[in-house]
Regions:
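Solvent-exposed soluble domains appended to multi-pass membrane proteins
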Residues: 1-177
């Protein structure tokens, strides 16, 4: 991940840390609401996801921030849109709002590169101050790449390595936008 590695040179990095969950879905309530992963099933898909919490988004809303959650998947997928609403996000942007089926990966939602470009365009339209959260999809099983990138990223020892390289590339394009 050459681009992500390059960002670490300009970041506060903790080398001795642990993940707050086993799956990517566990990161969302940890980051947004400070909720640790304490259950076998993800908090977002549990009956507890509608509990009252006062997390980062609600605090930013009180400070007159515009808040938006981005996820290139279908509404209802993993209850991301529901959790975004309960967490207090002003807006949710997913596959329906993106509205370009040619960039659909056939499984999770919109490929990272085009959805991150959409994300950048929307960010540029927001008035300040704002807070936006983006959940990327392409680095998830079954690890599909867009047809025009099939030969661009080399295989690695694990199938996920190609799509992680693609996500790294997509993030670089986002930062260049």
């Amino acid at each position: 991940t050459p681009f992500i590695d390059s960002l670490s040179r300009h970041s506060l990095v903790f080398e001795n840390a642990y993940s707050n969950g086993l799956r990517s879905i566990d990161a969302i309530p940890a980051i947004i609401a400070g909720l640790p992963t304490l259950m076998d099933d993800p908090f977002i898909t549990s009956s507890y996801s509608t509990n009252n919490t006062k997390g980062l988004v609600e605090i930013l809303n009180e400070q007159n921030y515009h808040t938006a959650f981005f996820h290139g998947g279908n509404k209802g997928t993993m209850n991301f849109d529901g959790f975004a609403s309960y967490a207090g996000f002003n807006e949710y942007y997913g596959r329906d709002e993106y509205d370009n089926n040619k960039d659909y990966d056939g499984h999770w939602g919109i490929y990272d590169e085009p959805f991150l470009q959409y994300f950048a365009k929307k960010l540029n339209s927001f008035t300040q101050p704002f807070f936006a959260f983006e959940f990327t999809l392409s680095s998830h099983y079954p690890y599909h790449l867009p047809a025009h990138h099939q030969d661009k990223f080399p295989e690695g020892p694990l199938k996920i390595h190609r799509v992680v390289r693609y996500t790294d590339y997509s993030l670089k394009k986002f930062f260049e936008t």
